[in-house]
Each structure stands twice: as structure tokens, then as C-alpha cells.
């Protein structure tokens, strides 16, 4: 967003003008324990735990580059410890997956029909793809993600939400009430819809 880009420029200006000792990191989409249930992955997991069909914006072909929060944290520490002052490092785990595939992976991991989800009206201006190239972080600072396979990180996340209902339960009803006011279940899009492998046709 423009505000995030603006903050990066401010940090660069402070480093150059006032000698502030700072680095900048930009990350891809996080997932993992303790993420608010309004977010895409925990919302779908907790819906399934509640016996509610997951909700997918539009055709679900929007791609996100997912990184487990533990890997994001170790990336940040690597930058703090060894990064060059004033430089920007991108933190990503090569986890590009489209949204419909994420939902199907969640359903399969939880022993459900991978097609047991609802399409809802798409978000306005829904970005098609986010991606991060973390080559610099890996080559210069020697960082590597622990969760190289998205599904293994996803399973660990599912296990956490199963075991910690007392953490997410108090915020679930209010979150779903807000979504219910804006989301409408629609038929699966015909043109550009996705098949079981997440491919468009």
C-alpha cells in the first residue's frame, strides 16, 4: 500500500539524513498460531472446526506468497543481527498458492470434502498476485525458512487452532457477524473458475 511504501521512504531518509541505525524488511503473507480469526487461513480453519463451510472470495484464483510466522520471525532476527544499515530485505518462503487451493488443502487436512466451501462476492480491487523474492536475504545473510513445504506449515497451524479454542473462540462470533453483513454466497463463477487442482479454464 501507499502508506507502507511511504514509511519505507521515511526510514531511508532518517538513515541518510540523521544517521539512524535502521534496516527495512518487507514480507509476504503470514500465517500460523495466534493470527486473528478475521484473516483468511484462520477463518477457514475455525469455520471447519465449527461445522461451517469455508468462504472463498470470487473464483479464488488470487495468489498469495505464504510464509509461516516463525519463519518471518527468524528472517527479521537475521536482518537485525547481520543486515546492512539502510538496506531493504524481502522475507518470503516461496509459498505461492492461490486461495482456492489453500481452502481445499485445509479441508483435506481436516478430513473434509475439498469442494465443501462457498463462493462469496469478491472484494473490490482484489489484488491478483502477491510475491516476494527473498534471494538477497538467503544469499547475503544465510537465512532459510523452516517450513519449506506450505502444507506442513498449514498442518501445524490447523493443529494449533484445534488445541487452542479458548484463544480464538471469544472473537469468532463478532468476526463472522461483520463478514455476514458484507458477504453474500454466490454460485461458483463459470468463466475463469478453478478445477480441483486450482487451474483456471
Model-derived features with residue positions:
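Active-site Tyr-X1-5-Lys
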Residues: 1-23, 48-50
